UniProtKB/Swiss-Prot annotation:
The active site is at H60, D77, C127. It is an enzyme of class 3 (hydrolase). GO terms for biological process: proteolysis. Interacts with protease cofactor pVI-C; this interaction is necessary for protease activation. The record marks G57, G58 as: Cleavage. GO terms for molecular function: cysteine-type endopeptidase activity; DNA binding. Requires DNA and protease cofactor for maximal activation. Inside nascent virions, becomes partially activated by binding to the viral DNA, allowing it to cleave the cofactor that binds to the protease and fully activates it. Actin, like the viral protease cofactor, seems to act as a cofactor in the cleavage of cytokeratin 18 and of actin itself. This is Protease. One of its GO terms (cellular component) is host cell nucleus. Its EC number is 3.4.22.39. It comes from Human adenovirus B serotype 3.
Amino acid sequence: MTCGSGNGSSEQELKAIVRDLGCGPYFLGTFDKRFPGFMAPDKLACAIVNTAGRETGGEHWLAFGWNPRYNTCYLFDPFGFSDERLKQIYQFEYEGLLRRSALATKDRCITLEKSTQSVQGPRSAACGLFCCMFLHAFVHWPDRPMDGNPTMKLVTGVSNSMLQSPQVQPTLRRNQEVLYRFLNTHSSYFRSHRARIERATAFDRMDMQ
């Protein structure tokens, strides 16, 4: 799977980068929209999930993290779409995996913390790479992975309602440049395949059809 029409990051690439970032012991893998949720409620865990079925080739990557200390599930969407927009654009809903995760806990109650700002440009194909960056923050600072940590402070979020605005495109482009520098520093796999990865995930990749 990738993030649509063969663009973006493959599952193999994401797994290799996530390992380089130190997420390996907690990383459950890459999944399509049928991700079952977190079935071991006492263990810190994370995953990268596509909004589409595997049979489609993929559409958009999201990252999930489970912090057992607070029974909290983190959902990171590089676009920061609302639940309604995720359903409208990708036909993706995550209530089922939350319900299954909750049933695995003792009190059957969990908290969802979801990203609401955009860090990725609207025509960018780097969603999978942004998910890797978030998971680095999650495994190193599981109590504050969305912000307030050295990794996610590197990028600047903008209101999702401004995603298409020319005014914020320079900020979103800078985010992607920062993302590439971050991965170049922390991932040997990225360094070895940088040219190909940057070409496949370019800021304007979705215009190159």
